[in-house]
Amino acid sequence: MSIQTDDFAPVPPPKRVVSAAPTSPQEEALERALRPKLLQEYVGQAKAREQLEIFIGAARKREEALDHVLLFGPPGLGKTTLSHIIAAELGVNLRQTSGPVLEKPKDLAALLTNLEKNDVLFIDEIHRLSPVVEEILYPALEDYQIDIMIGEGPAARSIKLDLQPFTLVGATTRAGMLTNPLRDRFGIVARLEFYTPEELSRIVTRSAGLLNAPIDAQGAFEIARRSRGTPRIANRLLRRVRDYADVKGDGRITQDIAQRALAMLDVDPQGFDVMDRKLLEAVVHRFDGGPVGLDNIAASIGEEPGTIEDVIEPYLIQQGYLQRTPRGRIATLAAFRHLGVAPSRQHTDLFGPA
């Protein structure tokens, strides 16, 4: 199968080409077209995939609703993709919404009462549900029932509505912000981890085939190793490298073409861009390697604290360039080496010789 992209409007580049955050509607449409549809097509997340294969198979065999599923991890790792795959594997409908959209209990009630037997309800950013909406959700998850108020004032009364059995799939980048009562109602909890370069190389090769973009193994790996362990970034870089190959080359994506294209995009071999380097430079140069508080870093580089915490930091921490401590962020010796700066005596004592 191949995907024709001529029908898609030109996609403006995101603020950061290595950002794992959702981008423009046009790019999201193309991203949806590249998503795997079934578990057998899904690359990576071996532990979560094995669990889901077993639990989905059991639910399908018994013709029951799958237990409620919580997916958490950094953005861009495939939480939305997995929700679609779960519904497809179960052969049921998927209803999709997000925590901020469900402002009032009636918003959630309207969704729940329209679900058919064993359907999947996907709530992205579930940690952002309001407390009053969350209260309505509890009996729905446990007993497939909701209580709604009819009328107003003294004449108001509560009625109980029965729901069809359904599966809630909740996704969040901040599992720690979920309330304990909500977290406890998920029978299946899966943490999505960053992907290895080898896994991302398989994803890039598959996506290139769908985009009719010739690519060799070295070209795919070059894109993969700079993709920060994130499929969304890998697919975005692939599309930009494909553009470069079409204009500056013969259309084939080789290692040399990928290296030149990614250098033009200012994505270095570690997958760092200008914003990553600004953060590391701020901690190393302005704050002597730390420890430094998140708000101070945010002010010094002109970014929101939440963006730093959710989008920029996770990869730097996972790769060992930054540490979070109770006293603040600390640059590691790897960060000093990456910037070509001699570590301070304090950091040498803390981490050992460079």
Curated annotation (Swiss-Prot):
The RuvA-RuvB-RuvC complex processes Holliday junction (HJ) DNA during genetic recombination and DNA repair, while the RuvA-RuvB complex plays an important role in the rescue of blocked DNA replication forks via replication fork reversal (RFR). RuvA specifically binds to HJ cruciform DNA, conferring on it an open structure. The RuvB hexamer acts as an ATP-dependent pump, pulling dsDNA into and through the RuvAB complex. RuvB forms 2 homohexamers on either side of HJ DNA bound by 1 or 2 RuvA tetramers; 4 subunits per hexamer contact DNA at a time. Belongs to the RuvB family. HAMAP family: DNA_HJ_migration_RuvB. The gene is ruvB. This is Holliday junction branch migration complex subunit RuvB. It catalyses: ATP + H2O = ADP + phosphate + H(+). Its EC number is 3.6.4.-. It comes from the Bacteria. Signal peptide: none annotated. Mg(2+) binds at residue 80. GO terms for cellular component: cytoplasm; Holliday junction resolvase complex. NCBIfam families: PRK00080.1, ruvB. Has 3 domains, the large (RuvB-L) and small ATPase (RuvB-S) domains and the C-terminal head (RuvB-H) domain. The head domain binds DNA, while the ATPase domains jointly bind ATP, ADP or are empty depending on the state of the subunit in the translocation cycle. During a single DNA translocation step the structure of each domain remains the same, but their relative positions change. ATP binds at residues 34-35, 76, 79-81, 142-144, 185, 195, 232. Disulfide bonds: none annotated. GO terms for biological process: DNA recombination; DNA repair. Homohexamer. Forms an RuvA(8)-RuvB(12)-Holliday junction (HJ) complex. HJ DNA is sandwiched between 2 RuvA tetramers; dsDNA enters through RuvA and exits via RuvB. An RuvB hexamer assembles on each DNA strand where it exits the tetramer. Each RuvB hexamer is contacted by two RuvA subunits (via domain III) on 2 adjacent RuvB subunits; this complex drives branch migration. In the full resolvosome a probable DNA-RuvA(4)-RuvB(12)-RuvC(2) complex forms which resolves the HJ. Its main location: cytoplasm. The keyword Transport does not apply. Residues 269-354 are annotated as: Head domain (RuvB-H). GO terms for molecular function: ATP binding; ATP hydrolysis activity; four-way junction DNA binding; four-way junction helicase activity. The keyword Endoplasmic reticulum does not apply. Residues 196-266 are annotated as: Small ATPAse domain (RuvB-S).
